[in-house]
């Protein structure tokens, strides 16, 4: 039986990028970078803990690193700490292990330094509205809303018939869908920073329509359904904090300034 509320799978594996190491940071990975005196991961997990729509929280990270960083606070931040796999999708599979197939899960990056409980609840309300029966609900944010608040934040923008968008750092998945489509997810993850190459994975005609900005959200959803055998929907959620992530040293400096 699914548990009440959304289960969170927060991904905090991997190693620290050279950009941060060159600046003298020694954190295990960017999730553990300090922001205002606390690891960024703590800010993210506290946001999930404060969200009304969230039940259980799982964090996929090295258990020893998590225990060393948080000590007695660890149990308050996460219900389960799970060792990561060899890559993004393997880590997702580890985080989903043992969940009921129909459990609704929020998969989240852990470099969303501006994440708040209310932004999470807005996303889940939107997912409940437009992707209630979906297996996968991909979060995305429109550029005009994002740039109105954070005009200097860089993103990979995708031009569609309905507007210009970037991906959010949170998406919704039904737990049973991950194992069913793991191979496809690996291919998508490898291309996620290159929208046109990702479009070619969908089909040459999709690539052409993406190139000209004429592809529609509904046709991308339909093609994703065909490729995966699942029900895939886009979850447009105009909360820009869901898309502000810390990829580079400049991003870290920016969010430190915003949170000052």
Q: What residues fall within each predicted segment?
A:
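N-terminal nucleotide-binding beta1-loop-alpha1 segment
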Residues: 1-26
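Conserved core of the sugar-phosphate nucleotidyltransferase
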Residues: 115-226, 237-241
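Short beta-strand-to-loop acidic/aromatic patch adjacent to the donor-nucleotide binding site
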Residues: 102-113
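Conserved N-terminal catalytic core of the sugar/cofactor nucleotidyltransferase
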Residues: 2-9, 39-104, 213-217
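Short, conserved phosphate/pyrophosphate- and ester-handling motifs at nucleotide-, phospho-/glycolipid
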Residues: 248
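Short catalytic helix/loop segments, enriched in acidic residues and glycine
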Residues: 25-44
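Short beta-strand/turn micro-motifs composed of small residues
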Residues: 12, 61-63, 109, 140
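Conserved active-site beta-strand element of glycosyltransferases/polysaccharide synthases
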Residues: 233-235, 245
């Amino acid at each position: 039986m699914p548990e009440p509320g959304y289960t969170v799978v927060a991904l905090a594996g991997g190693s620290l990028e050279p950009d941060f190491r060159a600046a003298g940071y020694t954190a295990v990975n960017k999730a553990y970078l300090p922001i205002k005196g606390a690891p960024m991961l703590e800010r993210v997990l506290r946001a999930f803990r404060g969200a009304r729509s969230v039940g259980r929280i799982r964090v996929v990270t090295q258990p020893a690193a998590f225990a060393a960083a948080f000590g007695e606070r660890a149990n308050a931040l996460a219900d389960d700490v799970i060792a990561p796999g060899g890559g993004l999708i393997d880590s997702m599979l580890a985080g989903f292990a043992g969940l009921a197939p129909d459990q609704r899960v929020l998969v989240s990056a852990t470099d969303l330094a501006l994440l708040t409980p209310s932004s999470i609840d807005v996303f889940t309300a939107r997912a409940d509205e437009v992707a209630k029966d979906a297996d996968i609900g991909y979060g995305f944010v429109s550029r005009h809303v994002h740039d109105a608040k954070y005009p200097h934040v860089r993103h990979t923008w995708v031009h569609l018939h309905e507007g210009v968008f970037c991906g959010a750092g949170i998406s919704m998945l039904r737990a049973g869908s991950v194992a069913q489509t793991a191979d496809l997810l690996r291919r998508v993850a490898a291309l996620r920073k290159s929208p046109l190459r990702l479009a070619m994975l969908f089909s040459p005609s999709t690539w052409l329509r993406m190139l000209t900005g004429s592809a529609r959200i509904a046709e991308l959803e339909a093609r994703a359904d065909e490729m995966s055998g699942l029900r895939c929907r886009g979850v447009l959620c105009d909360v820009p904090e869901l898309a502000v992530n810390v990829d580079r040293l400049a991003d870290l400096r920016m969010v430190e300034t915003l949170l000052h």
